């Protein structure tokens, strides 16, 4: 049984096969409409979510399946003290696959060790968000035609930004990429992302606080919000909030074919005057999210693509490498 706990739970070839499956489903959804008849997805969301939870539910419904779950720990037995381990054991009796979001890093990994069905990490604290990473890869490939030999700028909250950590890990598997990490000193990329993702594959990366200086040299810009919910000190959050604000005037410095991605929600880091610029790709990401999550569900359930007769994952293999940082923080 396979789980999707972090991007590298799937090999690079499996990730590419997943992207290809999502492309086929977007182009021709009809053959996939009943592949999950009689199957149930459980969405266990201990933190607030709009896009991730609704797109997972939409994905399962579009495959012919059903959903159940909760949105908020206060609506579950977690409010009574039930552990993640027990919840995973219990819900395994009700569902065929679980998507879990949790504020504590490592919680979905822990759940996967006790569940009897596949577990998808739908975001665990500041650690990882692998399904969002697949959405980001799909969007970049659509816009740039490749996932290698790109200069990718990440801007904003790189310390707590789990989407940044996950996408960095995934893009590190592709040749010739260069990473530019743009943030205030207090929100720099965590050391473990460098030691686990960048350094083993000898990736070239730089760190800076100057977005304007880097814009002319980027192939892709990935913006993130400053995440208030990760701060213990309100004063520190207010000091850093608004440190980067991309608007149409600043975007004139960037290449004409540089897509702007954002995992959403945005606060004030991207002005609404950017929305009508053809480089704005963040609502493309939302659109792609349903098809990627449909593909993830089919892959984990081992359901063959009716157009190719093949499955995405090798279900004979064990779970791939899981980050040491994720383990140690549980």
PLM regions and their residue ranges:
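Phosphate/diphosphate ligand-binding glycine-rich loop within oxidoreductases
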Residues: 34-141, 268-271
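A short helix->loop->beta-strand "cap" motif at the edges of active sites that frequently abuts
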Residues: 117, 175-177, 253-259
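Adenosine-phosphate binding glycine-rich loop
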Residues: 257-258, 263-317
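Single conserved hydrophobic/aromatic residue that forms the stacking wall/gate
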Residues: 318-330
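Glycine-rich phosphate/diphosphate-binding loop of Rossmann-like nucleotide-binding domains
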Residues: 47-59, 142-223
């Amino acid at each position: 049984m396979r789980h999707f706990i972090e991007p590298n739970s799937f090999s690079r070839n499996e990730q590419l096969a997943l992207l290809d499956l999502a492309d086929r489903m977007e182009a021709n959804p009809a053959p996939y409409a009943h592949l999950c008849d009689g199957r149930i997805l459980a969405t266990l969301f201990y933190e607030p979510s709009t896009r991730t939870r609704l797109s997972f539910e939409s994905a399962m419904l579009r495959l012919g399946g059903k959903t159940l779950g909760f949105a908020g720990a206060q609506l579950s037995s977690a409010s009574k003290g039930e552990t993640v381990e027990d919840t995973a054991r219990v819900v395994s009796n009700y569902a065929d696959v679980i998507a879990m979001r949790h504020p504590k890093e490592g919680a979905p990994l822990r759940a996967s060790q006790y569940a009897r069905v596949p577990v998808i990490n739908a975001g665990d604290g500041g650690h990882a968000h692998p399904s969002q990473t697949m959405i980001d890869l799909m969007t970049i490939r659509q816009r740039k035609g490749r996932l290698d030999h790109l200069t990718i700028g990440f801007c904003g909250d790189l310390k707590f930004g789990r989407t940044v950590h996950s996408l960095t890990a995934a893009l590190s598997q592709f040749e010739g990429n260069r990473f530019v990490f743009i943030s205030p000193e207090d929100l720099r990329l965590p050391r473990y992302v460098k030691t686990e993702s960048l350094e083993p594959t000898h990736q070239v990366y730089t760190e800076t606080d100057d977005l304007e200086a880097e814009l002319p040299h980027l192939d892709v810009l990935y913006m993130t919000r400053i995440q208030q919910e990760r701060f213990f000190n309100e004063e520190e959050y207010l000091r850093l909030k608004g440190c980067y604000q991309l608007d149409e005037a600043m975007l004139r410095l960037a290449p004409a074919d540089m897509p702007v991605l954002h995992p959403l929600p945005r606060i004030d880091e991207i002005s609404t005057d950017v929305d009508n610029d053809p480089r704005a790709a963040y609502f493309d990401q939302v659109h792609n999210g349903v098809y990627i999550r449909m593909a993830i569900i089919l892959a984990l359930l081992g359901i063959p693509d009716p157009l190719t007769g093949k499955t995405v994952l090798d279900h004979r293999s064990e779970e791939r490498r899981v980050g040491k940082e994720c383990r140690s923080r549980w």
